[in-house]
Design a protein with these regions (language model features):
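FIC/Doc superfamily catalytic core
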Residues: 1-348
């Protein structure tokens, strides 16, 4: 069976990319702490928006979808689930809320992970909720011609409970003893979790919820204000590529987890940069036009209305579209393409 020794990671020599990402994340975290002290009320506006985006994106990655209106109503608990997808979305909302409110009293143990998994399915009858997998699972790819290829075989069901215990013990030990930088330990833990693939269903969503939990417990709160899940969903091909690279040789213990570490740290840093941009937009009461104007000035090269929506999540899509039209009419932006392929370029 695969063994785990997180202390050995200390011996690894990290390249300048990894070290640079870690330094930049700490710098952004310092700025975020300052904003939180100075403008807590304004930042609260970002929390609910991030919850909605996180719930929508993390489920969409797994093909679990409903309309944007229904997502908002479900996250705000103004409606009840109508179908299986909405039941799963409501479960994700519940677990995310638990993590937001109680992260400091949720230990990283198998029992608590199983409880969170059970809560993920609390709106439906799933006899496997809160239990490790009962059958062997596989990570596969389906190609355009219809053939399916196995990319990775996770641990067998009988090996799973012990492995889940071991990664929790190793993580808690190196964090508790301050042996390992949390921004290294967190991606390593999440990568091992995904390679174990402990559940029959819900592994991807649980991995993203655990990422948020581990970051909060280590003092990195950017995911509360900027959706990490939305960042992953936007670049999910890069996410799967990094994961596939890092899984090679995992069973033998000679994997190279650096691609996954870089991917996750890059995502956290990108969220930190977005936090700065978004704070600048909520600091003062601006018109929709001025918000979109300022957001467009944060973009380099071509961008679309979805890019602006990420920076101005408090605006409706119709407000963003109307503002973009006015900026084009004012010769501040140039529009290219049509329909879904419409993009914009700054002229000023």
């Amino acid at each position: 069976m695969r063994t785990f020794n997180y202390s050995a990671i200390r011996e690894q020599k990290w390249d300048s990319d990894v070290l640079g990402l870690i330094a930049a994340i700490y710098k952004e975290a310092g700025k975020q702490e300052l904003y939180l002290k100075q403008r807590p009320e304004e930042l609260e506006k970002l929390v609910e928006i991030a919850k909605i985006q996180s719930t929508e994106a993390s489920n969409a990655i797994e093909g679990i979808v409903t309309t944007s209106t229904r997502i908002r109503q479900l996250v705000e608990e103004k409606t009840t689930p109508r179908n299986r997808d909405e039941q799963e979305i409501a479960g994700y909302r519940d677990v995310l809320s638990i993590i937001h409110e109680s992260f400091d009293v949720i230990p990283i143990t198998q029992n608590y992970i199983l409880q969170l998994h059970k809560n993920l399915y609390s709106h439906m009858n799933n006899p496997l909720a809160g239990r490790t997998k009962s059958v062997q699972n596989y990570i596969t790819a389906t190609y355009p011609d219809g053939h399916v290829e196995t990319l990775f075989t996770p641990l067998a069901p009988y090996e799973t409970p012990e492995a889940l215990d071991r990664i929790c013990e190793e993580y808690n030990r190196v964090i508790g003893n301050m042996e390992l930088e949390p921004l290294i330990a967190i991606p390593v833990f999440i990568h091992d979790f995904l390679c174990i693939h402990p559940f029959n269903d819900g592994n991807g969503r649980m991995s993203r919820l655990l990422t948020t939990l581990l970051l909060y417990r280590s003092g990195f709160y950017v995911g509360k204000y900027i959706s990490l899940e939305a960042k992953i969903a936007k670049n999910k091909d890069l996410y799967y590529d990094a994961l596939a690279q890092a899984q090679t040789g995992w069973h033998e213990g000679n994997e190279d987890v650096v691609p996954f570490i870089k991917y996750l740290l890059g995502t956290i840093l990108a969220a930190g940069k977005d936090f700065e941009d978004r704070v600048a937009l909520v600091e003062t009461k601006l018109s929709a036009l001025e918000m979109v104007r300022r957001a467009s000035k944060n973009r380099i090269g071509r961008f679309n209305k979805q890019d602006i929506r990420e920076l101005c999540p408090s605006l409706s899509l119709s407000s963003i579209e109307g503002s973009l039209r006015k900026l084009v009419e004012n010769d501040e932006l140039k529009r290219e393409g049509a329909g879904k392929s419409t993009v914009y370029l700054r002229l000023k």
